[in-house]
Amino acid sequence: MLFNLNYIDPTAFSIGPLSIKWYGIIIAVGILIGYFIAQESLKYVGLHKDRLVDVIFYSAIFGFIAARIYFVIFQWPYYAQNPIEIPMIWHGGIAIHGGLLGGFITGIIVCKIKNLNPFQIGDIVAPSIILAQGIGRWGNFMNHEAHGGPVSRTFLENLHIPEFIIRNMYIEGVYYHPTFLYESIWDILGFIILITIRKHLRVGETFTLYLIWYSIGRFFVEGLRTDSLMLTSHIRVAQLVSVILIIIGLVILIYRRIKYQPSLYKEAGPLTWNSSKAKVKS
């Protein structure tokens, strides 16, 4: 099928009865790019790349499962009536906060089993996670979901965004806030900041700054969305969780500052991989 930018079909292609969605492809691309960047980062902290494979592999799998379970729990009245749709993730419906929770818990467990420092591993993968999130939001765009409230075309034009985004924000006769784009830009900016300043940070601080940065952006973007998971009629789950994560991040940051540890990336330059590499430990 031809790719039409004026209206993007959520289905990338079909193989017989099987439809492959852009949503899944983009999420997979985000994970792969994040994995590559994390592997490159290992060269500068003295860890062999094989030390990270199990952490990322199991965290990605159980994080993805947790993301779906989290979404289903907060939409249980619907899924209780339609249980056959619970595994249909290609229709969308995964919650990033659920994925983070599942991935973090799994990562800590694997780190303990492999005798790895979870703060060190967290610092290595944090830039990769936020970049993957920024890329993954384009999957929501392809699915025509996770948008904000109604706006005018003039409003979108004043944002100076590409025309194909404006046209695909025209859904069932109404233009909507491209909240996917707001969050994607915020996440990618966070990625650039983290890999630029991480060599000046102490162990554990890159990860905690990721938590704080992502949560601040998510809190404000969530307020614009029309499909939020709601705890009550006035409390959005994602905003509540974001506030909790900001507090947790600040507590960890203060603790790590009091308990001094040197920078993890003394030899790594921002966005460059040509400085002297640390001796690799297997």
Swiss-Prot record:
Transmembrane regions: 18-38, 55-75, 89-109, 203-223, 235-255
Q: How does it sit in the membrane?
A: Multi-pass membrane protein
Query: What Enzyme Commission number(s) does the record list for this chain?
Result: 2.5.1.145
The pathway is: Protein modification; lipoprotein biosynthesis (diacylglyceryl transfer)
GO MF annotation list: phosphatidylglycerol-prolipoprotein diacylglyceryl transferase activity
Protein name as it appears in the record:
Phosphatidylglycerol--prolipoprotein diacylglyceryl transferase
- Subcellular locations according to the entry: Cell membrane
Task: Indicate the principal place this protein occupies in or around the cell.
Answer: membrane
GO terms for biological process, alphabetical: lipoprotein biosynthetic process
**Key word Transferase present:** yes
Which InterPro entries does this one have?
Lgt
- GO CC aspect terms: plasma membrane
Gene that this polypeptide is encoded by: lgt
Report the HAMAP family cross-referenced here: Lgt
